[in-house]
């Protein structure tokens, strides 16, 4: 699990497929959200990768026109290149690394039921297209195209890191990550993310369960406790309410942190460097800094 939090910044999500073999070399084709290249490699380099196509996390190294691939991690059991290609097309520019972390999490899920749930969510085009392109709010935080997935990714990564820091077992860390990633997914149905008259205004947490109804139904049948724990992450958090599941507590804390960091950064975005306090244009609150 720590590996997903420690990927090199240059590592990216790739689809790799062998094109041809000549003498002692293999030609492999790699596509990502930003690259489309073919590289000649020694057979040993890709010996653990399915030649017919496989999802990878790796570093593509270009030096003086010579291509190489390093630190290859195989994402198991993903064989549909079309799904990955669509995600590459949908993810907003500059947010490509989010896909690396989101898909890479599949390698670290200890429960087959949770893995099946997560794969089903990622493969659902009707869900993932708006999720990758929506805003997280109208005029509050992360209120721009791609803001929802950016905020959700922040919550997921921070929740997983805190869970590891506090010594939670792998299953709880996994629930914290997935719960953090999906805690706001109901926002894809809110008025500021839906064109025309079909958008709604209401508690987005209640829409989480509508958006994920198909996947959650299967999870409830196969792993009731996991369903309960994940549902706690997706539910409305009332003031002074204590969550029975610690991953839920962590997710709600990280949600607030992501919002506050976004508004803190905006408060100081357009003021001189020597200002030590400023009012956020979004929430009208006063923020301070030490340097």
Over which residues does each language-model region extend?
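C-terminal membrane module of polytopic membrane proteins
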Residues: 258, 273-287
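OB-fold (S1/OB) nucleic-acid-binding surfaces
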Residues: 19-41
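Divalent metal-dependent catalytic cores for phosphoryl transfer on phosphate-bearing substrates
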Residues: 144, 162-273
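Structural detector for short beta-strands of small beta-barrel domains
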Residues: 3-23
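Hydrophobic alpha-helical segments at protein termini of multi-pass membrane proteins
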Residues: 1-2, 56, 140
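OB-fold/S1-family single-stranded nucleic acid-binding modules
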Residues: 61-92
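Short nucleic-acid-contacting surface segments enriched for D/E, G, S/T with interspersed K/R
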Residues: 42-59
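Acidic/His-rich, divalent-metal-binding segments that scaffold phosphate/diphosphate chemistry
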Residues: 80-198
């Amino acid at each position: 699990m720590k590996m997903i939090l420690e990927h090199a910044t240059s590592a990216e999500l790739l689809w790799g497929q062998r094109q041809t073999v000549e003498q002692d070399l293999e030609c492999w084709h790699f596509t990502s959200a930003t690259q489309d290249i073919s590289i000649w490699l020694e057979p040993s380099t890709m010996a653990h990768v399915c030649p017919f196509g496989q999802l990878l996390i790796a570093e593509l190294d270009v030096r003086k026109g010579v291509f190489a691939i390093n630190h290859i991690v195989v994402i198991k059991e993903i064989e549909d290149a079309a799904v990955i290609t669509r995600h590459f097309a949908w993810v907003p520019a500059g947010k490509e690394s989010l896909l690396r972390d989101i898909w890479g999490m599949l390698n670290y899920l200890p429960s087959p039921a949770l893995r099946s749930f997560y794969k089903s969510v990622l493969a659902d085009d009707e869900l993932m297209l708006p999720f990758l392109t929506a805003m997280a709010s109208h005029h509050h935080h992360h209120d721009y195209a791609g803001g929802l997935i950016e905020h959700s990714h922040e919550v997921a990564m921070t929740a997983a890191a805190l869970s590891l820091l506090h010594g939670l077992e792998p299953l709880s860390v996994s629930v914290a990550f997935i719960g953090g990633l999906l805690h706001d997914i109901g926002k894809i149905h809110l008025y500021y993310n839906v064109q025309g008259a079909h958008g709604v205004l209401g508690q987005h947490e209640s829409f989480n369960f509508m958006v994920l109804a198909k996947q959650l139904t299967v999870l409830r049948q196969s792993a009731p406790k996991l369903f309960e724990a994940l549902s706690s992450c997706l539910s409305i958090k009332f003031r002074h309410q204590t969550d029975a599941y610690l991953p839920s507590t962590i997710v709600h804390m990280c949600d607030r942190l992501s919002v506050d960091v976004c508004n803190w950064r905006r408060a100081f975005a357009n003021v001189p460097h020597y200002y030590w306090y400023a009012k956020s244009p979004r929430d009208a609150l006063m923020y301070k800094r030490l340097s």
